[in-house]
Regions:
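N-terminal secretory signal peptides that target proteins for export/translocation
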Residues: 1-4
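Bacterial N-terminal signal peptides
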Residues: 8-18
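Extracytoplasmic/periplasmic ligand-capture domains
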Residues: 23, 63-65, 91-121, 129-130, ...
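Short, well-ordered beta-strand segments
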Residues: 28-32, 236, 358-360, 481
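N-terminal lobe/hinge region of extracytoplasmic solute-binding protein
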Residues: 31-81, 112, 179
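Surface-exposed binding/hinge segments that line
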Residues: 82, 89, 122-166
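Long beta-strand-rich cores associated with HINT superfamily self-processing modules
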Residues: 345, 487-511
Length: 511
């Protein structure tokens, strides 16, 4: 009896330290430039919201740190079982934060919801129906062959939702009450102040190593860096290049960089849309004329902006596709500044004496976005395009301009898509009727529709190369550069920046 008790005591002494070590501990603070517009991740198309959502929700598949697609809530990668049918086997034993089981009904509910008129719905348009085969198998029927199905399922907007908890609930309710299967649960969201998350002890992969994660919006670059230096935050995004050396030489913080999937561009309004994303007709402003758009493109010296504003921490692009994207064409070269050609195009468009223009830009969202917009404004003014710059806090920029099709005539935006495919660059921004579109070109739409259904990669790549050339000729946007993502982080963290801009506390640990 004594021996048995002694053995039990030894076992207890051995087990307790292991459990204590494994339990989530500590707190970190992550400073983003802006607060999310919503925590209903199916109803957003912005990275700050996706970063927070990646802690609360899981998707069927995801990209690992090397951007390779791997199973997540799916037990294995989806299989094409017919030309327009994808089968997905699901992981068992997973629960939502409220205790609801994750199963085939969850997938059916989530995919049907995300394609039904939400901000990201254009990415899920090919889904025709979702069939529940058994509790842990679904078959997704598509209206046409869909080669990017698996990569779209890694989209943060394809997050899985609990059908019982969310039945009949609107997006405002879900934004206030996010319930996922993710590694963290929401504790509170004090709008424009902080989002507090706590580790989910029942997470299917095992509990996170860090107990509490706080997101704080700090729009000002210098304030964000100062907070990092002072130890008020542990990770800071969008480090301005001119402050990178300070971080690199600081004894308690370090710089982590990654080539970004994001490009920055000037977008043009060429057509008008109503609030339901229906085409109204040609835009009545100056940017409806292709020659004006081309003149603006030739008036800008992007190389000088990259050198002078971004300290060389960016890469010129010929389109909105980076070398990381399927559809990228290395043979295409960026437009060089040509003031004579810009003036020639303006004269041909009926503006021999120049013209007046408004440029809208966010402030605090992208690396030195306001300064980039100011540099563009100065260059356009020198070229005879009298430009007035208006800057906005990012949430207002999206809600009051971009999401209601009133962003123009010219507006600065960044775009990064984790699918790494031209489909989710060109589709959401330029396809007729897309949620963010202010452009219409039936030839472009037809080629994009064709590319979206080609299962042969060579044919699909060739089609995107043709689309790239059409896009450059019609100039619905001026591609500026591929961003190089710069992060500052505390040396008490084990962490490395990713190229898809996600910051995952689950992958972090405290030293």
């Amino acid at each position: 009896m004594v021996l048995r008790r002694l053995c039990s005591l030894v076992v207890a002494l051995l087990v307790v330290p292991a459990l204590g070590w494994a339990a989530p501990q500590g707190k970190i603070v992550i400073a983003q430039g802006v607060d999310p517009t919503t925590l209903d991740t199916q109803n957003q198309q912005e990275t700050p919201a996706s970063v927070v959502a990646s802690h609360l929700f899981d998707t069927l598949v995801e990209r690992d740190a090397n951007l390779k697609i791997v199973p997540a809530l799916a037990a294995e990668l989806p299989k094409l079982v017919a030309p327009t049918t994808w089968e997905v086997k699901l992981r068992r034993g997973v629960k939502f934060h409220n205790g609801e089981d994750f199963n085939a009904e969850s997938v059916k509910f989530s995919l049907e919801r995300v394609k039904a008129g939400l901000r990201a719905s254009s990415n899920f348009r090919p889904i025709e129906k979702v069939d529940v085969v058994d509790p842990y198998t679904v078959r997704v029927q598509t209206s046409k062959p869909w080669p990017t199905f698996t990569s779209i399922m890694a989209f943060r907007q394809a997050s899985m939702y609990p059908p019982k908890a969310y039945a009949g609930k609107d997006t405002a309710f879900i934004s206030r009450n996010p319930i996922g299967t993710g590694p963290y649960k929401l504790v509170r969201w004090s709008k424009d102040e902080e989002i507090v998350l706590e580790a989910n002890d029942q997470y299917w992969r095992g509990a996170a190593r860090i107990k509490t994660v706080v997101f704080r919006p700090i729009p000002d670059d210098a304030v964000r860096v100062a907070a990092l230096q002072n130890g008020e935050v542990d990770v800071a995004v969008n480090i301005p290049p001119h402050l990178a050396k300070i971080i690199a030489n600081h004894p308690k913080i370090f710089l982590s960089t990654a080539p970004s999937i994001r490009t920055l561009q000037l977008m043009f309004v060429t057509h008008e849309y109503d609030a339901q994303h229906k085409l109204v007709g040609p835009y009545k402003g100056v940017t409806a004329d292709k020659r004006v758009r081309q003149a603006i493109a030739h008036a800008i010296d992007v190389d000088e902006i990259v050198k002078g504003v971004l300290d060389g921490k960016a890469v010129r692009t010929a389109t909105m596709l980076t070398p990381l994207h399927f559809g990228y064409d290395a043979s295409l070269k960026p437009i060089k500044q040509d003031l004579a050609k810009a003036k020639q195009l303006l004269t041909a468009a009926g503006f021999p004496g120049g013209m007046d223009l408004v440029l809208n830009s966010p402030q605090g969202r992208y690396v030195r976005d306001k300064e980039v917009a100011e540099a563009v404004t100065g260059q356009l003014n020198k070229a005879g395009i009298r430009t007035q710059l208006k800057t906005y806090e990012f949430v207002n920029y999206l809600n009051n301009l971009v999401y209601v099709h009133k962003p123009g005539p010219v507006w600065l935006i960044g775009w990064g898509t984790p699918t790494l495919d031209a489909e989710t660059v060109y589709g959401p921004l330029f396809r007729t009727g897309s949620n963010l579109g202010n452009y219409h070109n039936s030839d472009f739409d037809g080629m994009l529709d064709q590319a979206q259904t080609l299962m042969d990669e060579k044919q699909r790549l060739a089609t995107y190369h043709r689309i790239n050339k059409l896009w450059i000729d019609d100039m619905p946007a001026v591609p500026l550069y591929q961003q190089v993502d710069l992060y500052g982080a505390s040396k008490r963290l084990n962490w490395k920046a990713r190229s898809d801009e996600l910051i995952k506390a689950y992958d972090m640990s405290l030293k």
